[in-house]
């Protein structure tokens, strides 16, 4: 599965800006985030153009579908999931 190009992050720019400000988070490349030197979040573009985030949890990678454009409800759910997984680690 291909990495998602950065130009497809425009509708989640506010979420990514918040994540960048969290302690211990480093953006190694566009849309590739590490938490304390370990992979935490990256994005894929599936066949047909479906966008998906992979969030690293305690038990492994958790897929999170992010349709474009993302709804406000889905954006809040994504941010909530990121906060939960960040606290786990």
Feature map (PLM): residue ranges:
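Charge-dense, helix-prone N-terminal extensions
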Residues: 1-89
């Amino acid at each position: 599965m291909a990495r998602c190009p950065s130009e497809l992050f425009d509708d989640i720019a506010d979420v990514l800006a918040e994540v960048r400000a969290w302690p211990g988070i480093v953006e190694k490349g566009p849309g590739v985030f590490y938490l304390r030197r370990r992979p935490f979040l990256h994005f894929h573009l599936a066949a047909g153009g479906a966008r998906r985030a992979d969030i690293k949890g305690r038990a492994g990678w958790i897929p999170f579908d992010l349709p474009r454009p993302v709804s406000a409800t889905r954006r809040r759910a994504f941010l909530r999931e990121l906060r939960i997984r960040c606290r786990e680690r």
